[in-house]
Amino acid sequence: MPRRREVAKRIILPDPKYGDRVVAKLVNIIMFDGKKSTAERALYGALEIVSEKVNEEPVKILKKSLDNIKPMLEVKSRRVGGSTYQVPVEVRAERRVSLAMRWLVKYANDRSEKTVTDKLAGEILDAYNNRGAAVKKREDTHKMAEANRAFAHYRW
């Protein structure tokens, strides 16, 4: 890795409709082939569907869903001697949010609904109610970390 200066963090501007950075970041993650307006349309539609079903503010629902997906621990490979250990480490706050968003989008795309809007709405609702594939992924990640707790002293 280069030992030069640290790369400056790009500032993501708040999203135009809800004025929220989390929504803007999620739009960027959903975006495919640079089609931002399509990604925005899909997310805004999903948030509308979800807010109608739950009768709450869309951004509040989204943030609660992401909180239910955020992992606290994960495992990282660490080579010691001739063997590789899966060492449990705490996840940085920024990475927690980023992983939660990526998992939300990934597992939304794997769903069987017809449109991307419906897929996203379904996954956000499931995460809000603490079920669904993205929440299961978080549980599996935590189980892996718990199972490898014996190697926690190899942390760096």
From Swiss-Prot:
Keywords: Ribonucleoprotein, Ribosomal protein, RNA-binding, rRNA-binding, tRNA-binding
GO CC terms of this entry: small ribosomal subunit
Transmembrane region(s): none
One GO MF term: structural constituent of ribosome
The keyword Membrane is annotated on this UniProt entry: no
GO biological process: translation
Alphabetical list of Pfam families matching this protein: Ribosomal_S7
InterPro entries: Ribosomal_uS7, Ribosomal_uS7_bac/org-type, Ribosomal_uS7_dom, Ribosomal_uS7_dom_sf
Highest taxon, organism lineage: Bacteria
UniProt xrefs under PANTHER family: RIBOSOMAL PROTEIN S7
Subunit structure: Part of the 30S ribosomal subunit. Contacts proteins S9 and S11.
Family, similarity comment: Belongs to the universal ribosomal protein uS7 family.
Task performed by this protein: One of the primary rRNA binding proteins, it binds directly to 16S rRNA where it nucleates assembly of the head domain of the 30S subunit. Is located at the subunit interface close to the decoding center, probably blocks exit of the E-site tRNA.
Protein name: Small ribosomal subunit protein uS7
Organism the protein comes from: Geotalea daltonii (strain DSM 22248 / JCM 15807 / FRC-32) (Geobacter daltonii)
Gene it is expressed from: rpsG
